[in-house]
Amino acid sequence: MTVFMEDLTQQVVSSASPYVWSLVLAFATVLISIALLYLARFSAKLEVKDLADLRSMFDRFPAWGKRASWAQQNSFEAFSLHAPAALLAAIAALNGQTLPTIASLAAFAYPALRLAYICAYVFNVPLARSLCWLLGLLCSGVLYGVGLSALLA
């Protein structure tokens, strides 16, 4: 009986792993965007007086640093949309629902698209940035749709 339960537990947990990894990797892209922002802050030569008004230092950022700041802000917004979608899909998988392959693809594509989005933003490639943003949003939408339909079935 114990071997059966361990095998069953391993199967259930592994079915949720694409969505959990999506969540972990998506958070890693948020951390990358924060690191780029701090790199921009150091290139703007942070001074003691800036501690009283950090936003005024933004004017001294190089152009790429300003874009890194905007990418970082968007990373928090995008993560707050994606995290519930990934959790919803993970919960559906943990409940024994078999999710379609497109859900796993969307889960793994999302962090890659967010990383590409950040790079496109910092390097000022607006068309690629917009395309990555849209595709990332669609990936989150797929996870919401698949997760909800699996849980409501």
Task: Give, region by region, the residue ranges found by the protein language model.
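Short, strongly hydrophobic alpha-helical membrane anchors
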Residues: M1-A16, A153
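Short alpha-helical packing/oligomerization segments
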Residues: P84-A112
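Core segments of transmembrane alpha-helices
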Residues: V30, N74-A89
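Interfacial loop-to-transmembrane junctions
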Residues: L115-C139
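Membrane interfacial helix-start motif at the N-side
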Residues: V12-A16, F58-S80
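Juxtamembrane boundary at the C-terminal end of a transmembrane helix
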Residues: L143-A153
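N-terminal signal-anchor transmembrane alpha helix
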Residues: S14-L54
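Alpha-helical transmembrane segments of multipass membrane proteins
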Residues: T29-L37, L81, Y117, S140
